[in-house]
UniProtKB/Swiss-Prot annotation:
Organism: Helicosporidium sp. subsp. Simulium jonesii (Green alga)
Gene Ontology process terms (BP): translation
One function term, GO molecular function aspect: large ribosomal subunit rRNA binding
Record has Transferase as a keyword: no
Protein name: Large ribosomal subunit protein uL14c
Length: 122
């Protein structure tokens, strides 16, 4: 579950390494955000010479959480890190490549543009 002040890894090639959640925009509950939810975040760490600058305010979609994901078929899924993908206001990814697995809960949330870039879907 992602809430304000949570540090997330960035799972795309925009140049940002870490972001910190400021606000949950479209969440599944009042408490926090889960996989497929949209957040507003600030960039904390970047790579050198990137399009995204440090302390820039961005929107992101959560793609991996350390909190367990419970599926209807009885399967439980848990990742080692909290990760997000930077998106535009129209929910299109800013990067051209994604890293790591993407759960299919993102496609259920209507984020097909992110699913199309995913290397593999769990």
């Amino acid at each position: 579950m992602i809430q304000a002040q949570t540090i997330l890894q960035v799972a795309d090639n925009t140049g940002a390494k870490e972001i910190m959640c400021i606000r949950v925009l479209r969440g599944s509950s009042k408490k926090g955000a889960r996989v497929g939810d949209i957040i507003v975040a600030v960039v904390k760490k970047t790579k050198k010479q990137t399009s995204v600058k440090k302390s820039e305010i961005v929107r992101a979609v959560i793609v991996r959480t350390r909190t367990t994901i419970h599926r209807a078929n009885g399967m439980h899924l848990k990742f080692n890190e909290n990760a997000a993908v930077l998106v535009t206001k129209e929910l299109h990814p800013k990067g051209t490549r994604l890293f790591g697995p993407i759960p299919y809960e993102c496609s259920e949330a209507g984020l097909n543009s992110i699913i199309s870039l995913a290397p593999y879907i769990i």
